[in-house]
């Protein structure tokens, strides 16, 4: 049994956790069970335009949810497109967005990295209080670890928090976090944990996005 203070801490953590969804058919109805004030992140798919994310965000805007739309850098065409996106977000009074590089192999426009998009966001100006970026405790399938570390540190003056990639190993996450704190990372941390999903689908997704050793460990259990 956990001590009572651990139960309280776990309850607070779960109350502040957020659900990540894709802009798919029927998702609005499935989210109807969530209480007001629940955190919901809306992903940006490489197979759909960023407008699909914005459309779903607008459709959910009157539900009393705390919405966090994802704006993937490689899905934004140019500075003019970014300006339009920011205008839509400002009109909804969105309080937080998440800005990954994106899973698309080739950018559709001028932005190949999250940092480039964040820099233009800062120059254009916006009213979004919190901006999140991605972090990879287990590395990335196409980027070496030192480059990932340097990029995360370079982005932190343009962001307010980071979200770790899905990971199944608590010790690995905590060790990585301690190392990054020692290297100067001060942003608030949101830890990526696996949700309810079919085992094979979850493992396939994990390996595709770069979750390595901890996912392979799960396959043996």
Where are these regions (language model features)?
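Active-site glycine-rich loop that binds ribose-phosphate moieties when present
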Residues: 142-157, 162, 172
